[in-house]
Amino acid sequence: GFFRNNYIYMNNLQTIIKLNTDPETKDRYASLYGDNNMQIAVAEIVKAWVFQLLTDYFGDIPYSQALDIVNYPQPVYDTQKAVYDGLIAKLKEAQTMLENSTTDGFETGDVFFGGDLSKWIKFANSLRLRLALRASNADPSYLTEAQDAIADGVMESNDDNAMFRFSSSGTPNEAPWYNGFY
């Protein structure tokens, strides 16, 4: 279901990170898909988004040991606060990585923002803002994080929305729900 499938999906994102950090593969993936740090940052942002959905839905979840099945075949459940703190830190790291990246080669592979790194930064900061506002209900000290996220730039209009646009008829991602079930 929802819980298991999201961890499977995040393993794909973790593979992107591994391929872009492994000395044996990182040059190849940079030449194919653009700056390594940019790819890592985008994967971390999407992972943060999915982890946030999971912890908001289930509360305590595997986070710190998740996605490392070799070393942690039964990962511990982290508290929601620990997950939120970890996600905020990862989103800040991703923002810094994007600010120091180039878009060369990424434009065609970016199905969310077409290679626009400024929109990825806004998305990361908007996720930080959402995490901080939700956590501030339990701990008002998170309001400082919310203010920092706003100052760093967040989504302000529908032009900034993160969405996957399906391709036209006959292309690989045409109607994936229909194609997956019929």
Where are these predicted regions, by residue range?
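Solvent-exposed loop/turn segments at secondary-structure junctions
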Residues: 70-71, 136-138, 161-162
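Hydrophobic-face positions in mid-chain alpha helices that act as interaction patches
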Residues: 141-182
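Aromatic-lined, polymer-binding surfaces characteristic
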Residues: 80, 84, 114-124
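Secretory-pathway/luminal and periplasmic proteins that interact with or process carbohydrate-rich
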Residues: 50-60, 138-140, 152-160
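Conserved, well-structured interaction surfaces
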Residues: 1-64, 68-105
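Asp-box/WD-like beta-propeller blade repeats and closely related beta-sheet repeat scaffolds
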Residues: 108, 112-114
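Short, glycine/acidic-rich hinge or "gate" loops at secondary-structure transitions
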Residues: 104-108, 142-145
